[in-house]
A protein has these predicted regions:
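Loop/helix-junction capping segments adjacent to catalytic residues or to phosphate/diphosphate-binding pockets
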Residues: 13, 50, 91, 127-128
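Generic C-terminus detector
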Residues: 207-209
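Surface-exposed alpha-helical segments enriched in charged/polar residues
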Residues: 24, 28, 102-106, 139, ...
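A short, acidic, amphipathic alpha-helical segment used as a generic capping/interface helix at domain edges
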Residues: 94-109
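Non-membrane alpha-helical structural segments and their capping/turn regions in soluble enzymes
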Residues: 16-21, 91-94, 98, 131
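C-terminal domain-boundary segment and adjacent tail
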Residues: 31, 63-72, 110-111, 117-204
Length: 209
C-alpha cells in the first residue's frame, strides 16, 4: 500500500509545506485503514522535483514510484526515484517477461539481481477491456521457483538490508546488522549462503575459471 497524495495533486511547483500536507494527510488516511505505518508513495501524474523529494523525506516516505518505463530490470539506486520496468499495457511486456525469466546473461553495473516492476491502475482493465491481457501476463510469470514475488516495501527492505552488510577487510566474512536474513550467492555459481540477523558468516570462495 502506498500514499498517492490527499487530492492527487501535481506537487511540482508547490512549496514544501503544502507538499508535506498533501503527503501526510494521504498517509494518515491509509494508516487508519491499514493499522500500520505506510511509507510508500506513488507520484500523482508521475511528477516530482527537488522540493517534492525533500517533502517525501520529511514526511517519512522511504520509497516512491515514478511512471518512467525503463524496459530494464535494475534495482533503483535511490528508492525515492523508483522507475518501473513498464506499464501493464506496454507493447513489450511479454518480450520483457521472456527476457526476465530467461537464464541468459543480464549485464548491469548497478544491480546484482534482476527486478521486473510492472505498474498500472486496476480501473484501466475495465476501461480498456483488457483483463485477458493481464491474465496472460500473470500466467506467464507465475509459479517460478526461482522468482521472488514481493511488494515494493519488501523489496526496499531487503535491498537496504543488503546495502547495510559489513564485510571484513580481507573479503572473507560478512556481518548482517539488519533484522532480516540476507542471501548471498557466489560468482558464476548457483550456491549461496544465508546470513541471519546479527550473525557473521564466511563468504563463498571464488570458483576456478
Amino acid at each position: 500500500m502506498a500514499a498517492h497524495g490527499q487530492y492527487h495533486k501535481c506537487m511540482v511547483g508547490m512549496d514544501i509545506a503544502r507538499c508535506v500536507e498533501e503527503i501526510l494527510e494521504s498517509r494518515k488516511a491509509l494508516e487508519r485503514i491499514e493499522g500500520k505505518p505506510v511509507t510508500g508513495f506513488a507520484y500523482a501524474f508521475g511528477a516530482y522535483d527537488e522540493v517534492v523529494l525533500k517533502a517525501l523525506e520529511a514526511s517519512g516516505i522511504s520509497y516512491a514510484r515514478t511512471i518512467e518505463a525503463t524496459h530494464r530490470f535494475d534495482i533503483p539506486q535511490k528508492f525515492l526515484i523508483w522507475n518501473p520496468t513498464c506499464h501493464h499495457d506496454d507493447d513489450k511486456i511479454f518480450e520483457l517477461a521472456d527476457e526476465f525469466l530467461s537464464d541468459g546473461f543480464y549485464f548491469s553495473l548497478v544491480t546484482p539481481a534482476k527486478l521486473f516492476y510492472v505498474w498500472g491502475h486496476s480501473y484501466e482493465f475495465d476501461q480498456c477491456d483488457n483483463w485477458g491481457h493481464m491474465e496472460r501476463f500473470l500466467g506467464r510469470v507465475a509459479g517460478h521457483e526461482d522468482v521472488w514475488y514481493a511488494t515494493n516495501g519488501e523489496i526496499r527492505e531487503y535491498v537496504e538490508a543488503c546495502r547495510r552488510l559489513i564485510y571484513s577487510a580481507d573479503g572473507r566474512t560478512v556481518y548482517n546488522p539488519s533484522a532480516i536474513p540476507v542471501y548471498l550467492g557466489g560468482t558464476f555459481t548457483k550456491e549461496y549462503i544465508e546470513v541471519l540477523p546479527g550473525k557473521t558468516e564466511k563468504l563463498l570462495k571464488p570458483i576456478n575459471m
